[in-house]
Amino acid sequence: MTHLNLRLKDVDPEIFEAMEKELSRQREKIELIASENFVSRAVMEAMGSHLTNKYAEGLPGKRYYGGCEYVDVVENLARERAKKLFGAEHVNVQPHSGAQANMAAYMAFLEPGDTVLGMNLAHGGHLTHGSPVNFSGKLYNFVSYGVEPDTEKINYEKVFELAYKHKPKMIVAGASAYPRVIDFKHLKEIADEVGAYLMVDMAHIAGLVAAGLHPSPIPYADVVTTTTHKTLRGPRGGVIFCKAEHAAKIDKTVFPGVQGGPLMHVIAAKAVAFKEALSPEFREYQQQVVNNAKALAEELKKQGLRLVSGGTDNHLMLVDVRPVGLTGKRAEQLLDEIGVTVNKNAIPYDPESPNVTSGIRIGTPAVTTRGMKEGEMAEIAEIIALVLKNPENEDKHREAARKVRDLLNRFPLYDKLPYND
């Protein structure tokens, strides 16, 4: 029994060492990946708790296992907080990920082979919105809509034309790399016109929606999915919201349809994150995320870099690196070497392969969590431009790396974490 009380560093020093190095990486690099954030210690404590021991198939009050009275409290708190946060009629907090939330939503409303309209991955959509390499593109007949070549924004009239032509059973909205506001009301009107369900995947913008800084899809969509990390700043996981009339089929599709037992430690962490998101401080944080994104976009443009669609309305932006003679892959590598983490990303009408790309995606949630504001965005833009415009100049790279260290020293990340107290 003594093994129950041993510390991680004593039981598995190899894993402990890898975790220590990852903590150092997070502390010592400027995190600009739009889908990443830094959760609170409270969220980590819930996620790394003894709740991982408990099986709880089913829903609160209707479990297939005994001893669930306390995890029922946990899940009910998560559900009630999520409904309050987003003003939803019904929520299921059990999906293990955003992809599984999307799978459950599809399976609740569609049959294999049904036609679905979704945003093209290459134009900012997501793998689960119909990519042929994903289950969504294999099980359903997806027709893609995208952005215009000149504006690099969604043309809703063209979405309507596609919907009118193909008569989809469902229209999917939401994106993983679209820097502009999505008009859910307009998409609902299109869906109603052709008799389609409207599903919204708000994984990237959920935090902004919760804070009232992006129009909410909840009043318009039949079903809404999200992750709980990214801008929502919770643990990695998924959630599904829907109208009350669809509650039973959504719940049944999550379990036993696509999942077994829920991860109660993760649901506890979701509940903690939802409580944090209900605070006035969270809205202030989200406002700063948006302010920082706009500031960073403007500063990058001042540095001579081209932004897809000319800027951003949310937490992220896409930089076209072709004008500086780079690929997205090379730009990502160069920035990583001096301490700035981004991801290569396809841009609309990209001539490069998905493994190379012509762009990089940049987001502000994580740096905002560290406490950075508009002034620091100007510094970051200068660092990025210094490297991308001088890809072979090692002196410039050393200068950029020094600037990164100086900036991060002013914004320390995490004192102690639960695993290494």
Swiss-Prot record:
GO CC, alphabetical: cytosol
Recorded superkingdom: Bacteria
Any one GO MF annotation of this record: pyridoxal phosphate binding
Major site of localization recorded for this protein: cytoplasm
Organism: Carboxydothermus hydrogenoformans (strain ATCC BAA-161 / DSM 6008 / Z-2901)
Pathway membership: One-carbon metabolism; tetrahydrofolate interconversion; Amino-acid biosynthesis; glycine biosynthesis; glycine from L-serine: step 1/1
Places the protein is found: Cytoplasm
Sites marked Plays an important role in substrate specificity: 229
Gene Ontology terms: biological process: glycine biosynthetic process from serine; tetrahydrofolate interconversion
Name of the top EC class for this enzyme: transferase
InterPro entries in the cross-refs: PyrdxlP-dep_Trfase, PyrdxlP-dep_Trfase_major, PyrdxlP-dep_Trfase_small, Ser_HO-MeTrfase, Ser_HO-MeTrfase-like, Ser_HO-MeTrfase_PLP_BS, SHMT-like_dom
Functional summary from the UniProt entry: Catalyzes the reversible interconversion of serine and glycine with tetrahydrofolate (THF) serving as the one-carbon carrier. This reaction serves as the major source of one-carbon groups required for the biosynthesis of purines, thymidylate, methionine, and other important biomolecules. Also exhibits THF-independent aldolase activity toward beta-hydroxyamino acids, producing glycine and aldehydes, via a retro-aldol mechanism.
Record-listed E.C. numbers: 2.1.2.1
HAMAP family, A to Z: SHMT
Cofactor(s) of this protein: pyridoxal 5'-phosphate
Key words, A-Z: Amino-acid biosynthesis, Cytoplasm, One-carbon metabolism, Pyridoxal phosphate, Transferase
Listed PROSITE patterns: SHMT (PS00096)
Database matches in NCBIfam families: PRK00011.1
Residues the entry annotates as binding (6S)-5,6,7,8-tetrahydrofolate: 121, 125-127
Protein name: Serine hydroxymethyltransferase
Positions where N6-(pyridoxal phosphate)lysine occurs in the chain: 230
Subunit organization: Homodimer.
Reactions catalysed according to its record: (6R)-5,10-methylene-5,6,7,8-tetrahydrofolate + glycine + H2O = (6S)-5,6,7,8-tetrahydrofolate + L-serine
Pfam families: SHMT
Family to which the UniProt record says this protein belongs: Belongs to the SHMT family.
